[in-house]
Amino acid sequence: MTQTPVVSLHQVHQQFGSTTILSGLSLDIAPGEFVALLGRSGSGKTTLLRLLAGLDTPSQGHLRLPERRAVVFQEPRLLPWKNVWRNVVLGVKDRPTRDHAVEALREVELAHRADAWPLTLSGGEAQRAGLARALVRSPELLLLDEPFAALDALTRLRMQSLVARLWEVHRTAVLLVTHDVDEALLLADRVVVLEHGRIAAERTISIPRPRRPGDAAFASLRLELLGLLGVREALAAA
């Protein structure tokens, strides 16, 4: 039996003045599916994410979203005058308590910093707090907007492993916007490549988890995606 998509876009257009950002884009995301969105700068990734977050409305087309959504941005945007646990439950309905926040912080291995002030957190800790803030909302759709781009290499790998583990536990539908092909291949079930506001290619990733960049299938798919993004051509011309 086919599952009803948790996200459904059909012939979505988005224009700002005379500039077309998304042009007839159609995309479904199944419950529990992990989708990575790749594309060059200006391809429409951020515009699509803003539509899925409910921050903008499309100029034209059909868009169906779940009620419970959460976004983790590259910058966690924690309020410096509220301690970590209060940031985690900020805006949550039904009078959430410190216990709710600590439970979410425990999932991201940050419960020991519940009473800390945001400015005392490292970059990785702040991003963990951002993930906890998303988890406490029990989202049907989790949107990740290049959440690891500002982190050092080791912290980025640790955060990727954490996101993979959280997805295995919760099986929330996820859309990850990233420029990192390896990150997309490590985490996602499916990769969508945007170009000029349209879906230029989609690839299902059938490589068993846990995945390793050194595996032949991983390396082959990486080369294919780099080619779709124009990276190999740029390197060859350099």
Curated annotation (Swiss-Prot):
Source taxon at top rank: Bacteria
Main location: membrane
Topology versus the membrane: Peripheral membrane protein
GO MF annotation: an example: ATP binding
Amino-acid positions noted as binding ATP in the UniProt annotation, renumbered to this chain: G39, R40, S41, G42, S43, G44, K45, T46
Keyword Transcription listed: no
SUPFAM superfamilies: P-loop containing nucleoside triphosphate hydrolases
Keywords: ATP-binding, Cell inner membrane, Cell membrane, Membrane, Nucleotide-binding, Translocase, Transport
Chemical reaction(s) catalysed: ATP + H2O + aliphatic sulfonate-[sulfonate-binding protein]Side 1 = ADP + phosphate + aliphatic sulfonateSide 2 + [sulfonate-binding protein]Side 1
GO cellular component, one term: plasma membrane
Domain ABC transporter stretches: 7-221
Compartments reported by the entry: Cell inner membrane
Functional note: Part of the ABC transporter complex SsuABC involved in aliphatic sulfonates import. Responsible for energy coupling to the transport system.
Entry protein name: Aliphatic sulfonates import ATP-binding protein SsuB
Gene: ssuB
